From Swiss-Prot:
The gene is nuoH. One of its GO terms (cellular component) is plasma membrane. NCBIfam families: PRK06076.1-2, PRK06076.1-3. This is NADH-quinone oxidoreductase subunit H. It comes from Albidiferax ferrireducens (strain ATCC BAA-621 / DSM 15236 / T118) (Rhodoferax ferrireducens). It catalyses: a quinone + NADH + 5 H(+)(in) = a quinol + NAD(+) + 4 H(+)(out). It comes from the Bacteria. NDH-1 is composed of 14 different subunits. Subunits NuoA, H, J, K, L, M, N constitute the membrane sector of the complex. The keyword Cell membrane applies.
Length: 360
């Protein structure tokens, strides 16, 4: 279908420059716009889904007044934020103060350039996609640090210090987890990583979900998911913006769309971590069972459903667990997750050299 649309667009004009330069550029812009619209729509309505789940957990209704069943509540919230004044403290560094939110949201959006939504559906299906993701997602912490420092205020600065140490700590554990997946997949290409989970004994008998990486790499899967909570500053790791300690951390002095950009980055990163979890450990767009009924469903729907379940797990953890102390978070990252992920890196490496290697 995508190839058909591309061919139709290429044939709109007979001029050589159109097929050589014009249409490829227009086609790339269309794909980028479509992906950004999907991501922004998911981010917008994840806020509503989170508020409804929190309400159900607390035995109340949640947003249900704006539109049918409250479905227009996110749009009303967006309109409210767009019309609010963006305030700036008098002592703040003006340029850096406004640069911080931009540097926070841009990596969260740029990372989607290499995310495959199907076997042949990606903005850029590059061989070093995993390496690109590890690099681009590490840049978000700079926006948080700049925002906290440029506000010239006590609470934002403390939040920025916490953010820098927490993100660096858990990025190491996440990096080791991704290295393990890289070892068993023998590729940095995200499409190849998904394809590598569709082989083995269980895949041959139709139980695809048992051939995915989550089962043989279960400790790595759990470490990656929990580290993802810490990377996205979600409960129980939200000491960066702990309301009872430093009000809202690095976002204290922000309002209007500046504050909204931080929220956009947070929820975009939640979806990014969820999609990556699905691609690395849950078979990506592969159906869980090899049957006509399941194979009839398009792969991008399977990817979306699995990612939505992981996002729901993020919200479930928020509503179920209390916030950790800062020293407990650092201890968990440095004394448990990093050593365990390193040990499993060695274990999997040794496993792959034995006759019982299941990733051949």
């Amino acid at each position: 279908m995508i190839d058909t649309i591309f061919a139709l667009g290429e044939g709109l004009l007979a001029a050589p420059w159109w097929s050589a330069i014009g249409w490829p550029v227009v086609w790339a812009l269309i794909k980028v716009t479509l992906v950004l619209m999907i991501v922004m729509g998911a981010v917008t309505y994840t806020t509503l889904w989170e508020r409804r789940l929190l309400a159900w957990a607390q035995i109340r209704m949640g947003p249900n007044r704006v539109g049918p069943w409250g479905l227009l509540q996110p749009i009303a919230d967006a309109m409210k934020l767009m019309t609010k004044e963006v305030l700036r403290p008098a002592a703040a560094e003006k340029f850096l103060f406004y640069l911080g939110p931009v540097m926070t949201v841009m990596p969260a959006m740029a990372a989607w350039a290499v995310i495959p939504f199907g076997p042949d559906i990606a903005l850029a299906n590059i061989n070093a996609g995993l390496l690109f993701l590890m690099a681009i997602t590490s840049m978000e912490v700079y926006g948080v640090i700049i925002s906290g420092w440029s506000s010239n205020s006590k609470y934002p600065f403390l939040g920025a210090l916490r953010a820098s140490s927490q993100m660096v700590s858990y990025e190491i554990a996440m990096g080791f987890c991704l290295v393990v997946v890289l070892m068993v997949s023998a590729s940095l290409n995200l499409t190849d990583i998904v394809a590598g989970q569709n082989k083995g004994y269980f895949a041959q008998i139709g139980l695809n979900f048992l051939s995915w990486n989550w089962l043989p790499l279960l400790p790595i899967f759990l470490i990656y998911f929990i580290s993802g909570l810490a990377e996205t500053n979600r409960l129980p790791f939200d000491v960066i913006e702990g309301e009872s300690e430093i009000v809202a951390g690095h976002m204290v002095e922000y309002s209007g769309m500046s504050w909204a950009m931080f929220q956009m980055a947070e929820y975009a990163n939640i979806w990014l971590v969820s999609v990556l979890t699905t691609i690395m450990f849950l078979g990506g767009w592969l159906s869980p069972i090899d049957s006509v009924m399941f194979n009839w469903i398009p792969g991008w729907i399977w990817l979306g459903l699995k990612s939505f379940c992981v996002v729901t797990m993020f919200i479930w953890v928020r509503v179920s667990f209390p916030r950790f102390r800062y020293d407990q978070i650092m201890r968990l990252g440095w004394k448990i997750f990093i050593p365990v992920s390193l040990i499993w890196l060695v274990v999997v490496g040794g496993w792959m050299q034995t006759p019982w290697n299941i990733w051949k």
